[in-house]
């Protein structure tokens, strides 16, 4: 029986002043363990999602934890039948999740972590302002009951949204969440700096909540967007029902795929009337190469246009 592929989402805010020198040995550790996916490293820490065999993931995590700075690195696991990534990469970044505000440092200041088992009690408190820190395309397919959608298209827009809509003197309790915990952790650091005093965030993010909280007790509604070829996962962390448009990167449903405006790998109902001719031609060429590679049982020559959590 074929063993399922293990998908591990991991991150840690920690000062890595030698992150440039760390790139090559980290990449070699991924290759040695047969790992696919992308890891981002910066002075402020490490972030990414990777996949491989059980032994491979265990080997990579052991390698990471051999560094005393990463011994308690956070990671969440899920499983799938097909490899969700095509390449193995380590990227050097200014930030491991891009907020774009100087001075925000979760290594120095961060909100209160809330365990998944305690999350429901917090977010059902009428005095708590619940904010989804993810982007609009993620929120559209699933979120927590009663959560506010900032309708951002990039995490860089989050600070301006907060400044325009909320006041530390009025909004006394704020709870935030994101896919794996990293974005809301950085958002909590930002909000503390803006004067919000009681700031909470979901430890381990949505993925940890879905893993630990029974569906019958859950406050989660819908599916959860993930940054790999699975596109979404259900409450039981199995692969969801959405695909992703290669052109605009929007999650697309079965109804979207049935639309006359859907062309696999080229366009969907969300973007068919806004694509430039250059983008359309490029998408058509890319799709042809992908289909040829698939027919030959070869790796995809051009990776899907998926956003990384740090760049979204």
Curated annotation (Swiss-Prot):
Tell me the domain of life: Bacteria
Indicate what this protein is called per its UniProt record.
tRNA uridine(34) hydroxylase
**Record key words, sorted:** Oxidoreductase, tRNA processing
Which residues are in the Rhodanese domain? Answer: 124-218
Organism for this UniProt entry = Pseudomonas savastanoi pv. phaseolicola (strain 1448A / Race 6) (Pseudomonas syringae pv. phaseolicola (strain 1448A / Race 6))
- Show the CDD domains listed in the entry: RHOD_YceA (cd01518)
Query: Which SMART domains does the record associate with it?
Result: RHOD
What is catalyzed by this enzyme? uridine(34) in tRNA + AH2 + O2 = 5-hydroxyuridine(34) in tRNA + A + H2O
């Amino acid at each position: 029986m074929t063993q399922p592929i293990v998908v591990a989402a991991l991150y840690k805010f920690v000062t890595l002043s030698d992150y440039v020198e760390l790139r090559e040995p980290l990449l070699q550790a991924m290759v040695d363990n047969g790992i696919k996916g992308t890891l981002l490293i910066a002075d402020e820490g490490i972030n990414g999602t990777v996949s491989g065999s059980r032994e491979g993931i265990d080997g990579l995590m052991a390698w990471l934890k051999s560094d005393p700075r990463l011994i308690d690195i956070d990671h969440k696991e899920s499983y799938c039948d097909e490899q969700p990534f095509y390449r193995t990469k380590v990227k050097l970044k200014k930030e491991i999740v891009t907020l774009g505000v100087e001075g925000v440092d979760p290594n120095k200041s961060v909100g209160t972590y809330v365990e998944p088992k305690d999350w429901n009690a917090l977010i059902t408190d009428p005095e708590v302002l619940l904010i989804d820190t993810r982007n609009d395309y993620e929120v559209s397919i699933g979120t927590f009951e009663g959560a506010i959608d900032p309708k951002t298209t990039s995490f860089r827009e989050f600070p301006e949204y907060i400044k325009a809509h909320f006041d530390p003197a009025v909004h006394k309790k704020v709870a935030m969440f994101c896919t794996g915990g990293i974005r809301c952790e950085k958002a909590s650091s930002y909000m503390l700096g803006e004067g919000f005093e009681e700031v909470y965030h979901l430890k381990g993010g949505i993925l940890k909540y879905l893993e630990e909280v029974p569906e019958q007790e859950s406050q989660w509604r819908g599916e959860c967007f993930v940054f790999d070829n699975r596109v979404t996962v259900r409450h039981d962390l199995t692969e969801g029902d959405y695909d992703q448009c290669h052109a605009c990167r929007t999650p697309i449903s079965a109804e979207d795929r049935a639309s006359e405006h859907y062309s696999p790998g080229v366009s969907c109902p969300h973007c068919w009337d806004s694509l430039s001719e250059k983008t359309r031609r490029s998408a058509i060429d890319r799709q042809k190469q992908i289909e040829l590679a698939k027919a030959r049982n070869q790796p995809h020559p051009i990776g899907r246009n998926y956003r990384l959590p740090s760049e979204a």
